[in-house]
């Protein structure tokens, strides 16, 4: 077990070094030798884990995508646990993809660099496509379940709403990143939250009936220990 953990940690270190190089100098600056130097490893050790530069880049793209995904999943779980309205949960999810601070700005730089390379690299394109698909699925699932609980009107198409909201989010992310002075001083930043709120309000127009009942009802008996819960956007209401 310790040896496996060590191997995974080294792979993470290499992926982190790739991301550092992209953030500082761009994707074209990434070489196996520079990655090894940035990670504090020998070239031979890096090549032990990744036979080619393309393998190394693919792993780095998967790693940064997984890190963003983990934060999104945590936002959803937190929304379920605290019974937040679906629109609020989705706003929190979508802001994880927008470069509103230094860390997310670096992530955006890395993911967009890989997305550009993905135009001619099918393996990278698959990672990019999967990340976009999962986001749309999250939004569509929230809309679908919002229809069941009363937060979304019956005639709203979850798939169409997901495409619209994902497009708004991606556009805002690009506008924020383009600001030359960085996210903290960006003139676009003050508009991000109001614009997301306005777009989400078009879809999530109602109030959760279940939450309304729970606030009106007397306290219930505790849940049976061991009962399962499904941490998805739909169960936030």
PLM region spans:
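Hydrophobic alpha-helical segments that form the core
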Residues: 89, 109-110, 144, 154-175, ...
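Helix-loop "lid/cap" segments that line or gate small-molecule binding pockets
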Residues: 94-102, 109-120, 194-195, 199
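Hydrophobic alpha-helical connector segments
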Residues: 59, 70-107, 158-165, 189, ...
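Amphipathic alpha-helical packing segments from all-alpha helical-bundle domains
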Residues: 69, 103-112, 122-149, 160, ...
């Amino acid at each position: 077990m310790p040896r496996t953990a060590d191997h995974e940690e080294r792979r993470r270190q290499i992926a982190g070094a790739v991301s550092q190089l992209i953030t500082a100098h761009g994707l074209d600056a990434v070489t196996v030798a520079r990655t090894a130097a940035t990670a504090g490893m020998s070239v031979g050790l890096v090549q032990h884990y990744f036979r080619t530069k393309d393998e190394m880049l693919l792993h780095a793209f998967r790693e940064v995508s997984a890190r963003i995904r983990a934060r999104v999943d945590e936002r959803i779980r937190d929304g379920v646990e605290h019974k937040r309205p679906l629109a609020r949960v989705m706003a929190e999810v979508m802001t994880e993809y927008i470069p509103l601070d230094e860390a997310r700005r670096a992530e955006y730089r890395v993911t967009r660099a890989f997305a550009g390379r993905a135009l001619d690299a099918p393996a990278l394109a698959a990672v990019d496509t999967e990340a976009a698909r999962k986001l749309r699925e999250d939004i569509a699932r929230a809309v679908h379940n919002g229809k069941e609980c009363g937060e979304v009107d019956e005639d709203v198409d979850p798939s169409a709403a997901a495409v619209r909201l994902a497009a708004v989010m991606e556009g805002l992310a690009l506008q924020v990143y383009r600001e030359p002075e960085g996210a903290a001083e960006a003139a676009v930043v003050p508009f991000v939250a109001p614009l997301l709120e306005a777009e989400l309000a078009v879809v999530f127009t109602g109030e959760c009936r279940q939450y309304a009942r729970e606030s009106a009802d007397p306290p219930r008996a505790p849940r049976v220990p061991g009962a399962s819960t499904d941490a998805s956007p739909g169960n936030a209401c």
